[in-house]
Amino acid sequence: MAAAVRAAGCLPALCSLQAGHFLSRQLSLNAFPVAATSFLAVKTALSHGSLSSRETRRNHCLTSLSHVLQTQCCVSSPGNWTGQQCRPYSFFTKLTAEELWKGALAETGAGARKGRGKRTKKKKRKDLNRGQIIGEGRSGFLWPGLNVPLIKSGVVQNIGQRSKEEQQKVEATMVEQREEWDRKRKIKVKRERGWSGNTWGGVSIGPPDPGPNGETYEDFDTRILEVRNVFNMTAKEGRKKSVRVLVAVGNGNGAAGFAIGKAADRGDAFRKAKNRAIHYLHYIERYEGHTIFHDISLRFKRTQIRMKKQPRGYGLRCHRAIITICRLIGIKDMYARVTGSMNMLNLTRGLFHGLARQETHQHLADKKGLHVVEFREECGPLPIVVASPHGALSKEPEPEPEVPDTKLDWQDVKAMQGLKRSVWFNLKRPAT
C-alpha cells in the first residue's frame, strides 16, 4: 500500500521542489509503518552533510519517494514532478444497474410486492447497454479497431472525429433502433388456448428438457393443471410469495406422470415441474388401446371419482382435468364423474391411483384359472374370449352365489328404474 499524503506538505521544505498536486485520500502515517519509516529515513538523510548538496538531495528524494509512494503518484522528471491518482468513486459506481433500476421504478417497496400502484403509469425497464459499441461516444471520435476498421484499403487508419452532422445522424439512428426493439418486445406471442379464457389450465409447455446423459423426451408432452400463488411468512422477509405449479406429462401410449414445481418465478416453476414429472412416470394399462379394463370407483381424501368403461367412439365425458390427463395417457373413451372436493392435487393423485391399480383381463384369468369372456351387443349371445390362464385350467366353474361387492350409485338406480327425469319434463311450453 501507499504512504500518507500528509507528508506532501513537507516536500517543498525538504527537497526544495515545487509541491505537486496530489489527488488522493488523506491517510494517517500510523496506518503504514513501513512507509512512515522510509519517509523519516529520507528526512534524516537530507539534514546531514552526506546529502547536503542541492542536486544530490533532489535526486535522492525523488528516488526514495518513488518507492514509498509507488502506488499513489507518478514521478515524471526531476524538474516537473506531478502526483495524480484517478479513482472514480461516486454513488452510481457503488450500485449495480439492477439496483439503480429498482430505485427508479420503485420496485423495492411493500406496495410493489403486493401488486399495488397503477399499472398504466408504470415505467418499463430498458437495457441501456444494448446496441452500444465500444468506442462510441458523444464526441464522435473514430478509434481504429473499436468503432471503425483498423485497416482500410491496405492502409492503417488514424484516429479521427466525425463532423457534427454525422454524429447527430448516428445518435438519431441509435434512438430509432432502440424504439424499434421496444416495439418488438411489446408484441405478445399468442400461446395455445387452455381450458378457458386467459388461464394456464390445459396449456402445453412442451416436452421436458434433455437429461444429463443426452436422453431426450420429444415424444412426451406437458400440460399445466394448476397454477397458484402461495405465501410463506418468514422472520426475515415477511410474507414471501411463491408460485406453485401442478403439471402432467405423457406420451399418449400409456406412460404418464405428474409433479409439482415451486419457485419465486413462474417460468422457473414450470421448468422444475415438467423436469421432475418425467422422473415419476406410471404405466397405465389400456383395453385395446382406447379405454380402461373395468369400471373403477374410488375415494381419495374428500374426492370421489367414478370411472366407467365405454365402447370405441364414445369419447371422453369427464372433468376437464381428467380429459387432459387421459389424452396424455392415451385413453380415448371413458366416462368419469367427480363428486365431493374438487381439489386439483387430490383429483390428480386419486385418478393415477385408480388407473395404476386396475386389474387386467390376463391377471383376472390367472387368478381364477378360467377363461375371461366378453359379451357384446353386436355379437348377441356369442361370448368372445379376451384372456386365458397361463397355467392349468380350472375344471370347477365360478360359484353362483359369489356376487361382486359393488356399491350402487343412487343416480344410476334412478336411471335404471325410470325415475330420473329432466327438470323440464312437466313444464308446459306455449305453442310456437
From Swiss-Prot:
GO terms for biological process: mitochondrial translation. One of its GO terms (molecular function) is structural constituent of ribosome. InterPro entries: Ribosomal_Su5_D2-typ_SF (IPR020568), Ribosomal_uS5 (IPR000851), Ribosomal_uS5_C (IPR005324), Ribosomal_uS5_N (IPR013810), Ribosomal_uS5_N_CS (IPR018192), Ribosomal_uS5m_N (IPR048584), Ribsml_uS5_D2-typ_fold_subgr (IPR014721). Residues 220-284 form the S5 DRBM domain. GO terms for cellular component: mitochondrial inner membrane; mitochondrial small ribosomal subunit; mitochondrion. It comes from the Eukaryota. Residues 113-127 have a biased composition (Basic residues). Keywords: Mitochondrion, Ribonucleoprotein, Ribosomal protein. Residues 110-130 are annotated as: Disordered. Disulfide bonds: none annotated. It is found in: Mitochondrion. PANTHER family: MITOCHONDRIAL RIBOSOMAL PROTEIN S5 (PTHR48277:SF1). Belongs to the universal ribosomal protein uS5 family. Component of the mitochondrial ribosome small subunit (28S) which comprises a 12S rRNA and about 30 distinct proteins. This is Small ribosomal subunit protein uS5m. It comes from Mus musculus (Mouse).
